[in-house]
Structures are given as C-alpha cells and as structure tokens.
Amino acid sequence: KVGTQAVTSQNRIPLIENGTVDIECGSTTNNSERAKQVAFAINYFYTGTRLLVKAGSPIKSVDDLKGRKVVSTTGTTNFQVLRKLNADRNLNFELMGAKDHPESMLVVGAGRADAFGMDDILLYGLKASAQNPAEWAVVGEALQVEPYAIMLRKDDPAFKKLVDDTVAGLMKSGEFEKLYAKWFQSPIPPKGINLAAPMSQELKDNLKALSDKPAL
C-alpha cells in the first residue's frame, strides 16, 4: 500500500533524507545544489520565476520592483533567485519570506507586498483558484527556466531506475501528453478551472530526451 504525506518547501528534503518519505512529487526544482543531498528522476516539467501582482499594478517586469516590497515562499529556489537578482541589479527591493504559497498571495492581497515571485505555473494556479481571478495578473519575463522532477533518496540507483523507467514509459507511450492536456489545458472539476497553460518547448524536447539534467 502506498501512503501519502503532505510536505512543505522547508521539510521536503529532510523528510527524504531521513527516510520518512521515499518519493516526493511536487513543484520541486531539480538543481545541482539539491543534488548534493537527494536524487532526482527524469524532469517532467519546466517553469520560471515570474510575478503575481494585483490587476492594474504598475509592476510589469522585475525592473519595476525597484524600492518596492516583494514576497516569496521560504525554502524555494525562487526566493534565492530573487535575492540574487536584487543584489546583481541593485534594485533595493525588500524581500519578505512567507511559510507557503497561499500566505505569500495573502501578503500581496493585503497590500503588505507589491508582488509575489514564484514559478509561473504555480502563480497561474493560484490566480485561477482565487475568489476573483480578474483581480490578479501574472507579469514579467521568466527570470530563469528550471526543471521539476520527482525527488528521491540519494545513493539508491535501483530505486531511481524504477522511477525513471516509470516516467519514461509514460512519456514514450503518449500517456504523459494526455495527462498534461487533462490537467493543464482542460477544465478541472469541481470548479471547472482551466489553467490554459501550453506545454513549454523545453518539456516537449524532454519527452524525447528523457533527461534528468539539473538546473545550474
């Protein structure tokens, strides 16, 4: 029997490392830093950091963040990307941390921050699920493209091969594309929310490449 356990951005890696969780399926970026602690299967999604703002906000790009307040979720790569961007471009925005994505959105909704920086696909989901989606906008170019992958314990090549073979099987058979269309390009019950998110070129390419290459 397969058991499930909810994890957070902060505890997902420790729970894999200590054996509490065998496999983590979520919005987890496969990068070189994390690969020192855990292993990753074949990349199954690609996304980039963008900004969620209130509709009508003057913020249209990261350059508009100068001197403003920005929130992101603690323990995510997005938080690190924004911190580096702030220093590299000398934007002098105040970067705030929130415990999870809904809290980050609430901080912007309450006017305590001007923008929420996060993976664009997660922002599309939060916007679509909001009480009034028209009150929100996802803006700016993606700051970087990062792959998502299933995270599992390090130094267990047999288990990684099992997970890789399973993901590769879905991609080779065409089942992966059917699942993508169902969840990202069709109305989802019970509310009928449609993310209307086209498949990225990076993901299309990886359906053939079957790569587990990390982000830098």
PLM feature segments, named:
Residues K1, R68-K69, T76, Y124, ...:
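Extended ligand-binding regions for polar small-molecule ligands
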Residues K1, T28-T29, Y46-M105, D120-Y124:
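Bilobed "Venus flytrap"/periplasmic-binding protein-like clamshell domains
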Residues V2-D64, A142, K204-P214:
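Acidic, polar ligand-binding/catalytic clefts
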Residues G3-P14, L95-V107, Q144-E146:
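Short helix-initiation/N-cap motifs at beta->coil->alpha
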Residues N11, G26-K36, V81-N86, G109-A110, ...:
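A ligand-binding cleft/hinge motif common to bilobed small-molecule-binding domains
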Residues I16-E17, L65, V108-G109, I150, ...:
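Hydrophobic residues within well-ordered alpha-helices
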Residues F45-V53, A128-D164, S186-A209:
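Periplasmic-binding protein-like
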Residues T77-L95, E135-W136, V167-A215:
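Ligand-binding clefts/hinges and TM-proximal coupling segments of bilobed small-molecule sensing domains
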